[in-house]
Amino acid sequence: MKTTLDLPDELMRAIKVRAAQQGRKMKDVVTELLRSGLSQTHSGAPIPTPRRVQLPLVHCGGAATREQEMTPERVAAALLDQEAQWWSGHDDAAL
């Protein structure tokens, strides 16, 4: 996934230097650093386990037709479309 981050200049220089010293791509160095940072706990405390939440149940008038059914593929396509609209600055899919 591509994303844009606004990082301090000194941080980017350090990442570039590390990548050059290790003969690696910057994206690989950043990925490694993010994974390492996210796997560490703060102040020695264990990472909390995710808690279960209860989502609301939405009742509909009837069963969805095959064209209306929300398959994983349709959800992924809708999310990609929404992200593309967001990046283009036109959020027509806003609720």
From Swiss-Prot:
Q: Give the record's GO biological process terms.
A: positive regulation of growth; regulation of DNA-templated transcription
Q: Which purpose does this protein serve, as stated in its record?
A: Antitoxin component of a type II toxin-antitoxin (TA) system. Upon expression in M.smegmatis neutralizes the effect of cognate toxin VapC41.
- UniProt gene name: vapB41
Query: What superkingdom does the record give?
Result: Bacteria
The question of whether Electron transport is a record keyword is answered with no
- Kindly provide the name given to this protein in its UniProt entry: Antitoxin VapB41
Alphabetically sorted, this entry's keywords are: Toxin-antitoxin system
Does the entry annotate any disulfide bonds, and if so which pairs? none
* Matches recorded under InterPro entries: Arc_rbn_hlx_hlx, Ribbon_hlx_hlx
Does the keyword field hold Cytoplasm? no
